[in-house]
A protein has these predicted regions:
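Acidic, proline-/serine-/threonine-rich low-complexity intrinsically disordered repeat tracts
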Residues: 36-45, 58
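Ser/Thr/Pro/Gly-rich low-complexity linker/stalk segments immediately outside membranes or between
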Residues: 23-40
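N-terminal post-signal-peptidase region of extra-cytosolic proteins
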Residues: 87-92, 130-135, 175-176, 229
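Primarily secretory-pathway and cell-envelope proteins
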Residues: 32, 47, 52-80, 109-169, ...
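Membrane-embedded alpha-helical segments of small multi-pass membrane proteins
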Residues: 1-27
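A glycine-anchored, Pro-Gly-centered beta-turn/N-cap motif
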Residues: 88-102, 176, 180, 185-188
Length: 259
């Protein structure tokens, strides 16, 4: 894998790992506790950001971009349409194009989508804060001054404030990000591969338990990887977030009855 958040920014890494990788280079005090999560498929031969003078990835946590540069990176063919708070794929400035708050990001149930959040660092200067590859749906907290690039891979998908989300998932739970105690109940879950999603990604199938959506080096409290034919068990409590990346979570009692 090419060293630095800049490649993660463009290509991403599976699930919330992309955010962890960003944290490792955005924060010079990062302690490396998530290094074992990284996918090592990248050989470092491609430098998509050389035009921006960021060849020294060892110092990439300090890299910044203008809004124009961010738009150039992702292309100019995005719709960037907002209708009644619902956003098409595009690039949005929080506080200007959309309101701050918690957002629900639609995604394909079996294919990868991406989003990137940039922090405002100064006048027309932004540093990357989050880089996420996800399957299903996701949530992200946006603050005034942030810039988000929402790239779900399908022009029909939308991003909108959580209050507008009609979301009532039923077990077993497919790929996506869930609020424990709100979207799904606390308890023990059996984690198994979601074959149709796993077939469409080169990243590892896994369940991530997070205590918050800050993506700090201690945000992830548990990770369970699963391979074809395998099963893992994860326990979550109210207030946690459970990300399912190409896996299915079945309540333990339901899984036991089915076995």
């Amino acid at each position: 894998m090419l060293c630095g958040c800049l490649l993660v920014f463009l290509l991403g890494i599976g699930g919330c790992v992309g955010c962890v990788a960003c944290a490792s280079y955005l924060d010079p005090n990062y302690n490396g506790s998530f290094d074992s999560y990284y996918d090592d498929d990248y050989d470092g031969s491609y430098d998509p950001f050389d035009d921006y003078g960021n060849g020294d990835y060892s110092d990439s946590y300090s890299a910044s971009f203008t809004l124009s540069e961010i738009k150039d990176i992702f292309g100019s063919d995005l719709a960037n349409a907002v209708e009644d708070g619902s956003c098409s794929p595009g690039i949005y400035t929080v506080g200007e194009d959309i309101d701050p708050g918690l957002y629900f990001l639609e995604g394909d149930p079996v294919l990868e989508g991406n989003f990137y959040v940039f922090d405002e660092e100064g006048a027309d200067s932004y540093g990357i804060d989050k880089s996420v590859v996800y399957i299903g749906h996701y949530l992200t907290e946006l603050e005034r001054g942030d810039v988000i690039a929402y790239l779900p891979g399908d022009d029909a998908l939308r991003m909108y404030p959580i209050a507008k989300a009609s979301f009532a998932p039923e077990a077993p739970y497919q790929s996506g990000l869930y609020r424990v105690g709100t979207d799904i109940p606390a308890g023990e879950y059996a984690i198994t591969p979601q074959k149709d999603a796993a077939d469409n990604t080169t990243n590892e199938s896994a369940a991530y338990v997070m205590k918050d959506l800050e993506f700090d080096d201690d945000s992830i409290t548990d990770t369970k990887y699963v391979i074809a034919g395998g099963t893992q068990t994860v326990t979550v409590k109210d207030g946690d977030y459970l990300e399912l990346f190409a896996v299915v979570a079945t309540p333990a009692d339901q899984a036991e009855k089915a076995s």
